[in-house]
Curated annotation (Swiss-Prot):
The species this protein was found in: Escherichia coli (strain K12)
Pfam families, alphabetized: DUF1281, DUF1281_C
Keyword line: Plasmid
Name of the protein: Uncharacterized protein YubB
């Protein structure tokens, strides 16, 4: 089941009518333009949603989004809505970046940002693995791309 970012930050009816590529309504952005500006992704939906861990006072959810991580505003709204601390870990192998953000009741309080570093395979059967930055290794389900 997808994680619909439209339930976190609402869209605009005129944008939805105008369509993904736009051109139906003059002066109204295409849904593609609106989504990338508002949500940070070309399609405001998280895929392969998986509750990977949970306890009495936490839940860990993994999901993928197209191209890159959702905008900070999306994560801040979730943290504010549920009055919680939220850690957002992300990685994108295609563009070779990763990051971590911590929110407290909707406020961004800490950030890490870096480039992924890879092992050098020794034969054709071996795939490269992410080796750094150390703070991202084993923190995401997979490295996207």
């Amino acid at each position: 089941m997808p994680f619909d970012l439209l339930t976190v930050l609402f869209t605009r009816l005129d944008v939805e009518v105008n369509g993904f590529n736009g051109g139906v309504l003059n002066g109204v952005p295409s849904a593609y333009h609106w989504y990338t500006e508002q949500y940070g992704v070309k399609g405001p939906c998280g895929y392969e949603v998986n509750i990977s861990s949970q306890g009495d006072n936490f839940i860990q959810v993994d999901f993928d989004t197209p191209w890159c991580q959702p905008e900070s505003d999306v994560i801040a709204v979730l943290s504010r809505r549920f009055s919680c601390t939220l850690e957002h870990w992300y990685a994108e192998q295609g563009c070779n970046f990763c990051g971590w953000q911590r929110y407290e009741r909707g406020e961004l309080v800490d950030v890490l940002w870096g480039e992924l570093e890879w092992s050098s395979p020794t034969d054709d059967d071996e795939l490269p693995e992410v080796t750094a930055p150390e703070w991202i290794v084993d923190k995401v389900a997979h490295y996207g791309g």
